[in-house]
Amino acid sequence: MAMQKIFAREILDSRGNPTVEVDLHTAKGRFRAAVPSGASTGIYEALELRDGDKSRYLGKGVLKAVEHINKTLGPALLEKKLSVVDQEKVDKFMIELDGTENKSKFGANAILGVSLAVCKAGAAEKGVPLYRHIADLAGNPDLVLPVPAFNVINGGSHAGNKLAMQEFMILPVGASSFKEAMRIGAEVYHHLKGVIKAKYGKDATNVGDEGGFAPNILENNEALELLKTAIQAAGYPDKVVIGMDVAASEFYRNGKYDLDFKSPDDPARHISGEKLGELYKSFIKNYPVVSIEDPFDQDDWATWTSFLSGVDIQIVGDDLTVTNPKRIAQAVEKKACNCLLLKVNQIGSVTESIQACKLAQSNGWGVMVSHRSGETEDTFIADLVVGLCTGQIKTGAPCRSERLAKYNQLMRIEEALGDKAVFAGRKFRNPKAK
């Protein structure tokens, strides 16, 4: 079925920054998609095109990207008369029309907006749910509901506290369904609020960009201690484990790491990658930490490799791999990590996101689907994670509607699948393992 009209507009994301929204019309109706945006971005990500006009939105407008869709990409696609079910052909056409390595001509935010809308239209054209259409595109006969990784304590570039590490997450792996995982996550979250309020006062329960709390603590193990206490208080020590996103590239300084990077710089306190690795090993030993994302800088390959060989938990590449097949291949070859963080806007199209996922999975890696800190009410990634059978998703705390939009959509999907619903649970790293 051909596209009839493609129209893009500038909307606001959850941080009050502009982003791109696309409406695509076919005979079946209107299909709308909005593009997310990150705060801590890897230097190898596809280019997010911003206007740079300081008199509008402090330079963060996206009118150029919107215009590229309305004046160039849209008309070219309509003229080409491609079918919305041919996701790969549509994406390939846009990528070739852009012609740059990192989508810098039109902007990854322009190309992705159209790509997401096409995917939604393709599902409607086939008369199947979006998650089923995505599973078909990926060649997956199965569907799996993911374990949610709730980011309940925020630090790093997401919060105004002194905490260096960016995210402390809870994963209810012992739940029997996604719906139960949501309940357990929400209950631990509420207990955590009480624990933080009692220890640090009411101000400490203000939430960060992703709905997690941002108490003004400096020591990272203090955050882990708070989680441990809340998990115990909620009564789930056997069902909930911990994940972290360190985002270490944010505090990498001249070959070393600064765990107090929000204070005035003092090279005397910078530590080596090896020393930082020892700290992580102490976390793994003392807390139920099962996953660490971006433990080192995006170009500190040697430290990644030596660390991975000495631990048996999930080590996730985000800034390291940026959902990019070339970076993933490099990480596989160097044995740098064993899980890919999948963010659709890092690579900039649905087809390339699926390819990145398949590449990681074919090399025995886990895959975790992820939101960005600047989100919208769009729920595409909820369907994506089910269709790609990755078994794990992180899309914030059970707080703030742009986060809950995804979690609630996952509950609806589980309900629609009925007794065919499979929840990843403790097999979140490899949900297809029998």
UniProtKB/Swiss-Prot annotation:
Transmembrane segments: none
Modified residues (Phosphoserine): S83, S157, S176, S263
Pathway(s) annotated for this protein in UniProt: Carbohydrate degradation; glycolysis; pyruvate from D-glyceraldehyde 3-phosphate: step 4/5
A Gene Ontology molecular function term of the record: protein-containing complex binding
Ligand binding (Mg(2+)): D245, E293, D318
Residue positions binding substrate: H158, E167, E293, D318, S370, H371, R372, S373, K394
Coiled-coil residue spans: none
Active site (UniProt): E210 (proton donor), K343 (proton acceptor)
Residues modified as Phosphotyrosine: Y236
Chief location category: cytoplasm
Catalysed reactions, semicolon-separated: (2R)-2-phosphoglycerate = phosphoenolpyruvate + H2O
Intracellular or extracellular location(s): Cytoplasm
Domain of life: Eukaryota
Keyword set, alphabetical order: Acetylation, Cytoplasm, Glycolysis, Lyase, Magnesium, Metal-binding, Phosphoprotein
Tissues expressing this chain: The alpha/alpha homodimer is expressed in embryo and in most adult tissues. The alpha/beta heterodimer and the beta/beta homodimer are found in striated muscle, and the alpha/gamma heterodimer and the gamma/gamma homodimer in neurons.
Gene induction: Thyroid hormones up-regulate expression during hindleg muscle development and down-regulate during cardiac muscle development. Decrease in ENO3 levels with aortic stenosis.
Modified sites of kind Phosphothreonine: T72, T205, T229
Enzyme category, top tier: lyase
Manner of cofactor binding, per the entry note: Mg(2+) is required for catalysis and for stabilizing the dimer.
Record-annotated disulphide pairs: none
N-acetylalanine modification, residue list: A2
Role this protein plays: Glycolytic enzyme that catalyzes the conversion of 2-phosphoglycerate to phosphoenolpyruvate. Appears to have a function in striated muscle development and regeneration.
Descriptive protein name: Beta-enolase
Organism: Rattus norvegicus (Rat)
Gene assigned in the entry: Eno3
